[in-house]
């Protein structure tokens, strides 16, 4: 797939994601060892699937072509992994946290990718499920918190 896409001027990128064929650490390792396709480092879905995204950034920085930054409460993620909660239930319980308020080592990921010449995009994601109109700013407040955190982390790289 990667070669066929490249022959057409397109970069194919695999996005490991909860609830798909490529979710767990073993499945990601199979992709890394059995193909040349680039990866989307989705910090949230990797952590929920049992992969340390900072370790993956250290292990295979040359394979990372896109990054989705989100933070995760690993206690809730463990309940998804064990089958105690569905993914949707976990999202409703605020499994996804503003950057810096969860268990993803965002600074280590950014620092390692930066040191290895990563020049791609970082997408800030704040997944949520709203069942009613949010009070005050709702998820917008989380996005602002994440953006401020990201500015601080990036400011420390220079």
Outline where the language-model segments fall.
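Acidic/histidine-rich catalytic cores of soluble enzymes
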Residues: 1-103
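Alpha-helical elements of Rossmann-like donor-binding domains used by nucleotide-donor carbohydrate transfer enzymes
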Residues: 27-30, 108, 145, 149
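C-terminal helical cap(s) of enzyme catalytic domains, especially alpha/beta-barrels
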Residues: 134-158
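Residues at the N-termini of beta-strands
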Residues: 66, 120-121
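Soluble or luminal CAZymes and related metallo-dependent hydrolases
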Residues: 101-105, 142-145
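Short active-site-adjacent structural elements
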Residues: 77-78, 130-134
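Short acidic/histidine-rich active-site segments
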Residues: 123-129
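A structural motif corresponding to the C-terminal end of an alpha-helix
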Residues: 1-12, 107-119, 152-158
